[in-house]
Amino acid sequence: KREVVVLSAVRSAVGTFNGALAGMEPAELGGVVFKEAIARSGVDPKQISFATVGNCIPTESRYAYVARVSTIQAGMSMDSVAFAVNRLCGSSQQAVVSSAQAILLGDADFALGGGVEVMSRGAYLMPALRSGARMGDTQAIDAMVAVLTDPFGVGHMGITAENLAVKHGISREQQDAFAVESQNRAAKAIAEGRFKSQIAPITLKTRKGDVVFDTDEHPRAGTTMETLAKMKPAFKKDGTVTAGNASGINDGAAFFVLAAADVAAKAGQKPIARL
């Protein structure tokens, strides 16, 4: 039986909704992080024959080609296998599993796995235009919100959080306390530079010139119980889930370079982890 090892693990900094990464389409962002992950692994990109990319939200014309465009931009061969998977919140994890399975089955010696999502670029869909909206207003569906909405009528994922809070007896104060601790830990780790080694710096073109984006912008330093207590429920009257204690809407990418352990050892490559 083959063993699968991780040769590199690289991510972008996390961009907040409509923040620094909002101007990059997923295929471009994925390509930048792909390329850095491959460079750090020490593997020739032409040797990597398999890639799986987790991606959910429709964005623009190259949405369906996010895996192929990312791999080509990273220097992989046109002969390589590249496909996207949508398992909603677990898409990136499924991508890692799928790439690892390809190695275990002998379909590849080296593979990429991870995901990219730019929620800020979620498309608005207008189904009526296909057959011709002949007169009057027509509906525009927010694809980003649609992905966050239960397809069987329960509602937004925020309602799922409300239902779980009731089911497990999790109070508003407990949720706020967890959020404060999470924000403060993130802020402390950023201040101490603990994430620098895992982040691929991204050069962004702006009106003021090139700007290097290499620090998570979503965490809010200085968050307190007092500030969170002032926030109103976001999804349900008299609910407990707010914009301050709920999961954030953000943008980013993260990828592993995976390898068969025996092949990596023969090539003199040192793994950082084992699956």
Name each model feature, range by range.
Residues 24, 52-110, 151-157, 222-248:
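Conserved catalytic cysteine-centered active-site region
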Residues 1-56, 60-70, 74, 160-172, ...:
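Conserved active-site "lid/cap" helical segment
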Residues 86-117, 159, 165-194, 256-263:
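Active-site-proximal alpha-helical scaffold in enzymes
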Residues 46-54, 82-86, 111-116, 176-181, ...:
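Beta-strand segments within the central parallel beta-sheet cores of soluble alpha/beta enzyme folds
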Residues 10-13, 54-58, 87-91, 115-124:
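Acidic, glycine-rich active-site loops and adjacent beta-strand->loop/helix elements
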Residues 10-12, 22-32, 40, 174-266:
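N-terminal extracellular/periplasmic Venus flytrap/periplasmic-binding protein-like
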Residues 110-163:
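Flexible glycine-/small-residue-enriched beta->alpha junction loops
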